[in-house]
Design a protein with these regions (language model features):
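A conserved structural/catalytic subdomain of Rossmann-like adenosyl-cofactor enzymes
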Residues: 1-169
Length: 169
């Protein structure tokens, strides 16, 4: 993998208690979006989803950290989902739950107030679809990479390899 975040999450998962544990970890967008199907990152995400450990992802406001303005995500991972959460992943849009700081601290210009925290926690605990919460079956996040190739054409002829199969363009 090109990003160690998912490797670290694998390590945390390996430390979960068999009777049930919950992990909360903040990531940038990289663990969500990097890696082609069949690649390292994609395979780790697949492993987490197939084992039904990913419970919730909360998209946090940007500009929450001192040294960067990037958007971050709170992942909640557990090996003991409640029956209503089994086979499902909740996505919470927490980007509007912040208060602006009077004075920026580097790139940090926003913070989540206690009231904002309670709104996000309420969305998590209610586990209902609404304007900030989506609930999807685990299979919603599975995909297969498909590559469509065109044959290599030179001077109007399809070029073939030694086996007689068309060479890809």
């Amino acid at each position: 993998t090109s990003d160690g975040s998912l490797l670290f999450l694998q390590h945390l998962i390996s430390k979960m208690e068999p009777d049930g544990s919950r992990i909360g970890i903040v990531f940038n967008g990289s663990p969500l979006f990097t890696g082609d199907a069949g690649g390292g990152e994609s395979e780790i995400r697949k492993w987490i989803i197939e084992n039904d450990w990913l419970e919730t992802i909360v998209q946090l406001p940007d500009r929450m950290f001192f040294n960067t303005g990037i958007t971050t995500y709170l992942w909640i991972v557990t090996n003991k989902k409640s029956s209503k959460r089994k086979g499902k992943i909740q996505l919470i849009n927490g980007t509007s739950f912040f208060k602006s700081m009077r004075k920026n601290l580097g790139a940090k210009g926003k913070e989540i107030s206690k009231e904002n925290q309670q709104e996000i926690i309420k969305a998590y605990l209610n586990f209902e679809e609404n304007e900030i919460s989506q609930i999807h079956e685990n299979t919603f996040f599975c995909y297969t990479k498909v590559v469509v190739e065109q044959p290599l054409i030179e001077d109007g002829d399809i070029k073939t390899n030694k086996d007689g199969n068309p060479k890809p363009d």
